[in-house]
């Protein structure tokens, strides 16, 4: 366990990852001094795992915060941090993977990533990131060649580990049929209102660590919901345990054997979110949470197309829960 109280998880490749990370997807203060200062404050209060992506456009601010943290002595070396970034869909082509990773490293001012993830199981026509994706730009991903390029990035030392995001059991199976090295992480939405039972069981059987995002319902995001934070069940448990609803939700995810990333730019909540590892939910608590109605928060609508690989949400997520 780290000095900040966050347990370390050993991934199937052997590298160790903090069980809790700070998410960096933010629209309101993207690319601002406030964003950089929030990352710097997170390092100061004890966060050592940061989750970014080319699409978040937060890599440069995070890189500046890391450089400043080193200068201020908040950390002694870059090796104290675990940095994750993600390959955007327009770069999910065999010849573009390495250049995309190298661009992320330039943004972050780093020599290597700890974890590099494919952001979605879809490719787009090559080009700059755009908020509104033309439907005819959505393409099926060549899992074999793209994953081989991800493996090459790891072999070259630009990332210590590789994985995926938002992959269903079916997509994972397709990828692993030709992979030399299986993904070590699958980052997906998971919370008390989306248990992901089938996917969790599949990933566990294949030594893939689930990293949960939208653990608190992605409140504030365009697709966000108050279903988690306003849950009466979670509120009752929180009162009984002397914890916050956020802490109960995060603790539930951790007790399912998953790692997680959460985001807050508020210092008090940053500190609160770290305090989920020295207590447990009871069997009765877990039973109550198991009965919470289930619904997905995140949407794949922007990656659906009549001519693309996925035409409906159900097809994209391959949901059986």
Swiss-Prot record:
NADPH binds at residues 27, 51, 187, 214, 216, 264, 269. InterPro entries: AKR, AKR4A/B, Aldo/ket_reductase_CS, NADP_OxRdtase_dom, NADP_OxRdtase_dom_sf. Keywords: Alkaloid metabolism, Cytoplasm, NADP, Oxidoreductase. Optimum pH is 6.8 for reduction (forward reaction) and 9.0 for oxidation (reverse reaction). Substrate binds at residue 119. Its main location: cytoplasm. The keyword Oxidoreductase applies. The record marks 86 as: Lowers pKa of active site Tyr. Optimum temperature is 28 degrees Celsius for reduction (forward reaction) and 30 degrees Celsius for reduction (reverse reaction). It is found in: Cytoplasm, Cytosol. One of its GO terms (cellular component) is cytosol. Gene3D superfamilies: NADP-dependent oxidoreductase domain. Its EC number is 1.1.1.247. Pathway: Alkaloid biosynthesis; morphine biosynthesis. Latex secreting cells (laticifer cells). Expressed constitutively and ubiquitously with highest levels in capsules. Restricted to the parietal region of sieve elements adjacent or proximal to laticifers in roots, stems, leaves and carpels. Belongs to the aldo/keto reductase family. NADPH-dependent reductase involved in biosynthesis of morphinan-type benzylisoquinoline and opiate alkaloids natural products. Reduces codeinone to codeine in the penultimate step in morphine biosynthesis. Can use morphinone, hydrocodone and hydromorphone as substrate during reductive reaction with NADPH as cofactor, and morphine and dihydrocodeine as substrate during oxidative reaction with NADP as cofactor. Converts morphinone to morphine, and neomorphinone to neomorphine. This is NADPH-dependent codeinone reductase 1-1. It comes from Papaver somniferum (Opium poppy).
